């Protein structure tokens, strides 16, 4: 069954997508200020994996740990991590969109933050903003919703200190984007891009996002 984009877009008109770096921080701040419902795609992964089947979601069903003989995700080769994430997100996106359509009937405003198939969602979404975080202190692993790679590796008793450091360095290499072309796709899709850095506070960026979405013109806590 192929559902026209216009129908999906109408169903998602009260869903506001925040993409890029710092999206979780800004989404949580909007929740604090407006009591919005937050849909985190990272939090939905396990739920979607339980629904996946090898025919329709082969990448979601693959046992990469067994295939490559590793104990943690970040021990996989960098190219395997990139390929796995690309296809995993592509397969998971229709499942998340189905959930968002259902949730859109229960909430006046939904903030959807997290990784999703941007090219698939852009044509069916009315509200999207992309964040470019240029802060020199940004650490992908140093946040409450991400497992701290240093803590995880430090607890391993089967590795030497040198092996532990190699895994840590490899993990950071895998999550470090290519800044030279990091926002090319944002411009290609015609998305609003908001830059924040060491001179921009979380409050300022939250206000920029809220203003772009038109939230500041509405009554708080009425969602």
Sequence positions of predicted segments:
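Post-Walker A helix-loop "phosphate-sensing" segment adjacent to the P-loop in P-loop NTPases
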Residues: 32-42
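Walker A/P-loop
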Residues: 24
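ATP-dependent NMP and nucleoside kinases share a basic, alpha-helical "lid"
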Residues: 112-154
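Small-molecule kinase domains that catalyze NTP-dependent phosphoryl transfer to phosphate-bearing small molecules
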Residues: 146-212, 216-223
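Pre-Walker A adenine-sensing motif
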Residues: 2-9
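Short hydrophobic/aromatic beta-strand immediately N-terminal to the Walker A/P-loop
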Residues: 14-17
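ATP-dependent small-molecule kinase phosphotransfer cores
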Residues: 46-108, 115-116
């Amino acid at each position: 069954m192929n559902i026209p984009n216009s129908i999906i877009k109408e169903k998602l008109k009260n869903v506001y997508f925040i993409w890029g770096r710092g999206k979780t921080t800004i989404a949580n701040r909007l929740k604090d200020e407006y009591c919005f419902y937050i849909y985190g795609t990272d939090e939905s992964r396990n739920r979607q994996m339980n629904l996946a089947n090898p025919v329709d979601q082969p990448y979601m069903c693959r046992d990469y740990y067994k295939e490559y003989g590793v104990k943690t995700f970040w021990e996989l080769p960098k190219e395997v991590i990139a390929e796995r994430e690309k296809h995993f997100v592509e397969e998971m996106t229709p499942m998340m969109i189905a959930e968002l359509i259902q949730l859109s009937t229960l909430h006046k405003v939904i903030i959807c933050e997290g990784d999703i198939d941007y090219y698939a969602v852009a044509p069916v979404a009315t509200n999207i903003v992309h964040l470019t975080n240029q802060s020199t202190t940004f650490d992908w692993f140093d946040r409450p919703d991400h497992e701290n790679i240093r803590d995880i590796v430090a607890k391993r008793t089967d590795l030497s200190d040198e092996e532990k450091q190699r895994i840590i360095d490899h993990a950071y290499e895998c999550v470090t984007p290519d800044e030279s072309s990091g926002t090319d796709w944002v411009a290609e899709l015609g998305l609003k891009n908001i830059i924040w850095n060491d001179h921009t506070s979380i409050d300022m960026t939250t206000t920029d996002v809220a203003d772009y979405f038109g939230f500041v013109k509405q009554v708080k806590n009425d969602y």
